[in-house]
Amino acid sequence: MNRNILEEMLQYLLIDWIVGDQFEIQLNQQLWSLIPNNDVRRLVSHVIRTLKTDCTETHLQLACAKLISRTGLLMKLLSEQQELRTVSMTAWKPRMNRKSRSRMRS
């Protein structure tokens, strides 16, 4: 193989890897509020990055469609779980009764 072609291929792969890493880092930051668990968030970011790069190949499109669907379901479940946590935390905040508030004012 011609050395120049090999160098160009390696350079392309390196640029693709760097851009992919930047994409994954940004995605990880955006998912932070939705997925507080770092390991799960990194997994989801990596899956999305993989889908973005590998699903353009024709022979992988059916498998990718299934993975995209299941990833969407996972994101929906995680979102619902986060909403329940938020509601639960709000409901359990201690509330001061009227007597306590009136004592604090005096």
From Swiss-Prot:
Name of the coding gene: LRRC37A5P
Superkingdom in the source lineage: Eukaryota
Protein name, as recorded: Putative protein LRRC37A5P
Lineage: Eukaryota, Metazoa, Chordata, Craniata, Vertebrata
InterPro entries to which the protein is assigned, alphabetical: LRRC37, LRRC37AB_C
